[in-house]
């Protein structure tokens, strides 16, 4: 955390958000997801250590972590895959802890994912966001995401 002068006799504290790609699932990562996932979804339980390990080892997905003061405060999953017309990417499961919102973690996570996708040949990056997530939707639009005229369909395989 740094304090910087931004006007005559005015200072503000600047918080440094660090973004890293998760390569090892340890207790800290498991505990972070136990805290984060309920803030993202009321209907899905947090992933187990084994499920997180499968995610981290998958060649099709990259798990980004946001850290504030050395503590995991957010995550984003980037899924990348090839289709006949090129490499595509999807941003999924973006969540920032309530206590860390407003410090740029969401934007930093998304920018890291966009940079990674571009560096790895993706030609588009898509995401979905519920309309009720107003702050997230404003962020995505501010970052340059465009709302698409498209129908999104889901087929439930459970049961």
Where on the chain are the PLM-derived regions?
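A conserved beta-turn-beta hairpin within the catalytic core of GNAT-like acetyltransferases
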Residues: 81-91, 101, 148
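Conserved active-site alpha-helix within GNAT-family acetyltransferase domains
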Residues: 107, 131-149, 154-155
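Conserved N-terminal entry element of GNAT/NAT acetyltransferase domains
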Residues: 1-27
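Conserved GNAT-fold acetyl-CoA-binding loop/helix
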Residues: 24-54
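A short helix-loop-beta-strand connector motif used in the catalytic cores of GNAT acetyltransferases and
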Residues: 54-65, 85, 90
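Conserved acetyl-CoA-binding loop-helix of GNAT-fold acetyltransferases
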Residues: 96, 102-115, 138, 142
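Conserved GNAT acetyl-CoA-binding A-motif
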Residues: 110, 117-129
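Conserved beta-strand in the GNAT
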Residues: 65, 71-80, 90, 95
